Amino acid sequence: MKTGSSVENVRRLVSADLSKVLLLAKSCPEAAQWLPSEFELHIEDVRGWVIGDREILFGFLAVRTITSAHEMELLNLAVGPNWRRRGYASALLNVALSECRSIGIQSVFLEVRESNQRAISFYTKHGFAPSGRRPNYYRNPDEAALTMSFKLAN
């Protein structure tokens, strides 16, 4: 696969990807670390996408839609350390936002560690704005979350 951010390289996350997604997340300490049981418990509620080739996942994105509120929560976005700065995170986010628009989602929100300046810059570049703060949201280490939101144009 040539490196690049082409959305043609993004596909839906399927349950067979679970072990690769969990391994990828472990290689990214800033990503939310889910237990396999947590992921399996929520697999019906979570939509996800992966980017990679037949053997290796470069990154993944997981969201939960709250249809009654026309909202989507971005739960986790991670790109492996060896695959960063190639546009893969942007490709994943763009596919997710495109699907949100197509199903009538009006806003997207997320939480990010206050110390994760790289992620905050990434989301800001993609149109997200700070919308609040949640003290002591994260554990290991304890840290506040910055909440960010993005309004989708219909």
Which residues are covered by each model-predicted region?
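Conserved catalytic core of the tyrosine transesterase superfamily
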Residues: 1, 107, 113, 142-151
